[in-house]
Amino acid sequence: MEPISHLVKSSLPNYLSSLPVPDSIGGWFKLSFKDWLALIPPTVVVAGIGYTAYLAYCPAARASCSAKISGRCNNQIRKNEPKVVDMIDVEDIAEKAAFCRCWKTKNWPYCDGSHGEHNKQTGDNVGPIVIKK
């Protein structure tokens, strides 16, 4: 506990008081390159804390982030089966058929273009598998 106490009561205040923070707006333009380098670490820490708070408390950021890191791809199609397998005879295909690979289609197993919205939300680049005769 003593190291934490020393950090909070002595080291951190000494570090912060030694930072070259100017008293006026004009003082920012007079900082040297070395002064600017000294201001980078606390700026990165403050930005990191702000970004973490943004992800924690902003619903839009949370939804976007969780969509990108979600490991499951099938969220709705035949969830009662242990493995979804569809057999399609090549003779049944007229000229060509596009099959879904993103699991977002409402017309399973055929692609209806739902991957476009999925790609926008997740940054993915999935598309259909197209079979030609």
Curated annotation (Swiss-Prot):
Cytoplasmic topological segments: 59-133
Bilayer-crossing regions: 36-58
Localisation: Endoplasmic reticulum membrane
UniProt cofactor(s): [2Fe-2S] cluster
Secreted keyword on record: no
Keyword Metal-binding in annotation: yes
Biological processes, Gene Ontology terms: intracellular iron ion homeostasis; mitochondrial transport; regulation of autophagy
Recorded topology in the membrane: Single-pass membrane protein
Keywords: 2Fe-2S, Endoplasmic reticulum, Iron, Iron-sulfur, Membrane, Metal-binding, Transmembrane, Transmembrane helix
Cofactor note: Binds 1 [2Fe-2S] cluster.
Classification via InterPro entries: CISD1/2, FeS-contain_CDGSH-typ, FeS-contain_mitoNEET_N, MitoNEET_CISD
Spans within the Lumenal topological domain: 1-35
MF term (GO), any: metal ion binding
GO CC annotation: endoplasmic reticulum membrane; mitochondrial outer membrane
Positions of [2Fe-2S] cluster binding: 100, 102, 111, 115
Family: Belongs to the CISD protein family. CISD2 subfamily.
Protein name listed in UniProt: CDGSH iron-sulfur domain-containing protein 2 homolog
